[in-house]
Amino acid sequence: MDSIKKNTINRINGLPINHNNLSKTSIISMDDDYNSNSSFYSTNNSILNSVTKNSNYLNNNNNNNNNNNNNNNISISNCNNNNTNNKINEQLKTFNNIFEEKGEFLKEEIDNKFNDIISLMNQSKNQLFLSLNDIDSLYDLSPLSTTSTITLENNNNNNNNLIKFKLFNNDSIKKYILPVSSKTIKFKQRQILIEQQEFNEKHNQQKHLLELQRQQVLSDQQNQFQEQHKQQLSLKQQELEAIQQDTNKVKQQLIETHDKLLIEKEKQFKQDLNSLELNLQNKFTNEYQSKEQEFNKKLEQQQQQLEKQFQQTKELLIVQETLTLKSKLTTEFQEQLKTHQDQINKQELLLKQQEYQLFLKQQEISSIQKQHQDDLSSLKSKLSSDQDQIKKQLLQQESDLLKKQQELLLKQQELDIQSKQLKEEQEKQQQQQEKQQEKQQQQQPVVVPVKPTTSTVVSATTATLIKAPIVSTTTVSTATVSKLVTNGIAKPTPLTTMKQTVTAVPTLMDNKTRLKKLVPTATTTTTKEENNKEYDKMMQELDTQPNNSNLKNLNEKKLETLKQQLTFDDSVSFSNGNDESSINLSKYLEETNKSVENTFDIMSNTLKRKNEPIQQPSSSSSQLSSSQQPSSSSSSSSSSIGLKKRLSDDKTTIVTSKPTNKVQPQSLNSNINNNVVPPSPVAAIANKLKKQQELEKLKLEEEERLRKKQEEQLAKREVEKEQERLEKKKKNDEKRKKVEENQQQRILEEEKKKKEAEDRELARKHKEDSDKKKREEEEDAKKRIQERFRETQEQERKREEFKKQQQEQELARIKKEKLQQEKLQQEKEKQEKQKQQQQQQEEEQQKKKTVQTILPTPQTPSRSANNNYDDAANTASATKAKYALSSILSMVFGATKSPHFKPSTSQDDQDDDDCEDYDGTDENSENEAKGEYQDDSDQEIEEQFENDSDESMASTESNGDIYFNKNKNSNNSNNNNDVNQSRKDKSIVFDSDSLNRNHNDSNNSSEEEEPERDPVFLTPLPKILSNMKNNNNNNTYSNSPVIKGLSPPSSVSDYSPSSESNDCFSPLTPTNNNKINNNKINNNNSNNNSFNNSNSYRGLSPAQIIESHTPKCINRSGESKTSPFLTIRNTPSPLKNSPIKFNMSSASSLSSFDSDNDSDYNDNDIDDGEILGNPNENFTTPLKNQENNNNNNSNNSNTQYPIITSPPSNEDGDENYYFEEEEIDYEYDKRVPDWAKNHNLDNSLKQQRFYDPDRIFSMIGPVYLYEIFPKQDLGGKIKDFSKVKRNLSSDWSRDCNTEKEDISYKKNMGFTNPIIVNKK
């Protein structure tokens, strides 16, 4: 805070501000010393403004005098300026001392009062914090004596409003962050952007041209000041006396105002304290009442809570009584439980005993099972060994079978022919069988038909061996045949494709004993891969075979023949009474039954269980399990019955092989008793049938038991499912209830949240309103601070400019003195050189005379007769002879043809003054002489140009103009004349080679050093080179040489404030054709004019612009008759035909124009033969030019536009439109809107430039053209623009801006936080 206070005091006193003490963002309260010092701002500003006006007026006069006076008047003006400046500085120091003393006095008083009030507030806060616990202690608080508001008057002439600031209330204290360091930068950036936009617009052309006119006015004023200088000096003294009187009056007024302010502040301070006391009393009373109400509410709440607690105690007593009853019942129930538990314990002991007994039994059973498992494992090992042997045999058999399959495939086509033959063969077989039966009855041997299979197990009788044809048949299951029939394929399949089991070979014991054991050989198993291969082969064969409808009939007939054979065999065995025949028949039946069963199992497993290994039960395993079964006769009978049933079920048979007559006999054991007679086969068959029926009954009973168990299990499962379903229902109901409760709770919570949100929104709206008010007040305060800060900056800037001007004047004076001294020294050196040259000439003349005396005549020899001369005499004569020879040769052959380069002696004395000696031996001496000459000439030119450059720099910094002044041009012309005269005096004989070298070097250096354009090196070219270039090149700019330090002419439209700081200047020199009536410029020679012709700008010189008076304002674009080089603007002016009505009285324009006065000026006012120097001439100036390009066809450099100057404007501001028609009445014209008919529009627009647009946009909505012009006639049709949307019509009057465009426009204008109002 102290740093801010210091800065405010420094602002009052005009001292610089210490920004180092401030941070980037400093919190400033509106209750600080700003209020106390606000009144001093206005008074101080008014005084300082009056002083600065006077000082500026004097400074302008002094500057004008300094620029216009010649070297003789410089010293006088400097003395006067120094005296006036010293007086003004003394006055300012006195003012600053007075303000410092009184400001510190007020500051101390305000600080003391402020500290007292803060101490009182702290005491009251401490008392409040202590009294919050005890409500009764609030009565003891005493009110505080503090002030609430302080009113201060602004002494500004424009606004006499009262500024009120609320103090010492937390709600009213308004603090905001003021970026001290960045605000000024943003403000400057904003100004730069606005200036750039203004210069980019069309009417900036007029602004720049008007600035040139302003310079012309200044030049006229300078001429007037030169004439009236003596009168002004007398007036200045009178004005100084008046200023002193004014300052004395101001001092008295300040003292009086200071006393009044002190009295008023004391009164206001007392009033504020009283108002604060009243406010505090009101607050305390309100707070006490609010707390009493809260206390009463709390008491009521406590009473309600006590009533609730009383009811809860009653409920607790009732609960206790119920608990006592429950405790009694629980004791009784526990006693019953104890008795019941005793019983349960006894039962558990019994159960444990039973379990122990069962455990013993289980151990016995497990031991028996282990024994059985050991036996089984031994049997399995034996079987595995047998299986390995059988597998080997089967592999060999399979190879044979594959060969047979190929043969069968070839014979399938002959099946139709063989079917007929088979019928005949069957009849023959029947006849043969009948014959054989007759023979058997006679001879009593029995013929046993043997089944020839791949695993041919053959049995033979003991008595005889009979060769008979045996047909081997196989039966296929109905499932497989049905599949084949559905596909239309009922084909014979070879039986060799199926895996067959090796039948067990029975061993016959003694005749008295029965068949006891049947030793099993092995069972075969096949892998999945083999089954898959076999199955695929079978199906392929079936697919390849043709469909024959006769196969079915053939297979049916074969089945019938098999049945007949079986029945015939059974009848034969019953009729025969011999033991051997019955035994053989039983064996045959067993073998056939086993073979058929094996075939059925193999077919079913191969076709149905294709992916599983086949495990076929053998007759041996069945016989081991049933070791105590009846005899073989009974088994044979039962097997024959089973075979008949299967044959009756399966109606399809397939012939697998041809009948074979080969039989392998086997010899039976010879130890068979012929006396043993087996039982009859009928009894065995009957027993078998009984056993089968019993087995079927047992099976049915077991199936019923299983079915009952399944039904019971199903019933249990259904019951369990119903229970589960009921439980699920209960759970679902509970979940639904919970969900409903949660939903209700959520609804309540949402309602609460909505209410809270509404409350928050209301609070937020209140806060926003309060924040807006605070922001507006803060913005007002910021603007006021910024305005005052700007004023202080302007004052500081003016002071700095004034100091700079003084320093520049002193520097210019010092430089001029130095230049005078240097010139004097140069003149002395020249005189010395001339003296030396004269001495050298005299010596040369003496040498010539001595040569004539030394040279011998043709009659006398050149030598003397005496040979005894001294050495000194010989050397002297030798040197004299050399000089004599060189002079004679130069005289005879000429200077250019002589072997030694030497200046000519035939010139006059004026030419000999500038010549220099050259030695004849070294070529370096020639170069050194040339270099010395060039250095001397260049030094003279640079010294003269430095004088001009210093003056030009001073003029540009003071006035901010790009062009050269009139005095500078006159000085340049005079200096150039002096240089040219000095150059004419000098004449030296140069060699042709050296001239060419110098010419080329100058051209190269000028082209290479083109981009260097510092003002220090703005030296004109030597006169010799400029003449040579002008002779070789044309006068156009494209063919002109590029001169070091001279930039091409810059266009007017490219002018900007930043161009003042540029180092390059555009040379605007006059041409030969433009005749100027100026005595100072007429002194230029023809050589100077040839140099000026190289300028291709073809425009006007600064001298022409300065000397021309303000012409009449004529809006026309005709041909310029003043000079032939000025071109005509072919296109009409864009401002004349533009639809925009320029308001020239706005902030961007310079002055207002009268459209009526323009019509008064006629074209006949100006004669064709007038010159630009005349005051009433409408001269033209260049508007635009291209860059430094060498294009000869550039036309833009030749386009020029007339200057439109403003006539004397009316101060009323009634007619502000310059490009309007003459006969329009603005008050009655329907096309002019109402807001444009106001007479005070000019003043309002001028005041509008000081307003911040952000504030205006936030308060007022945007205005669109359809609101101003809602309807318009378009070809007889009225169009309503209020309904028109944005179109790409390229007509700005029909399009409406979007939000993005508004934001981008405001950002480009420099406002960082644009506010966009809703267009609705």
From Swiss-Prot:
One of the record's GO cellular component terms: spindle
One short Pfam family name for this protein? INCENP_ARK-bind
According to its UniProt record, where is this protein located?
Chromosome, Centromere; Cytoplasm, Cytoskeleton, Spindle; Nucleus; Cleavage furrow
Of which family is this protein a member?
A: Belongs to the INCENP family.
Gene inactivation phenotype reads: Null cells divide much more slowly than wild type, have a high percentage of mutant cells, become multinucleate and have very enlarged nuclei.
In this chain, composition skew of type Low complexity spans 54-75, 429-447, 615-640, 669-679, 864-877, 965-977, 1026-1040, 1047-1061, 1072-1096, 1143-1154, 1188-1198
The residues forming the signal peptide are none
Query: Is the keyword Glycoprotein assigned to this protein?
Result: no
Function statement: Chromosomal passenger protein that seems to be required for chromosome segregation and the onset of cytokinesis during mitosis. Plays a key role in the abscission of daughter cells at the end of cytokinesis and in the establishment or maintenance of a bipolar spindle.
Q: Which residues fall in a compositionally biased region of kind Basic and acidic residues?
A: 701-835, 981-1000
Keywords noted in UniProt? Centromere, Chromosome, Coiled coil, Cytoplasm, Cytoskeleton, Nucleus
| Name recorded for this polypeptide | Inner centromere protein A
Q: Which gene encodes it?
A: icpA
- Provide the assembly information: Interacts with aurK.
Q: Where is this region: Disordered?
A: 53-75, 426-447, 611-679, 701-877, 896-1215
Please verify whether the record's keywords include ATP-binding.
no
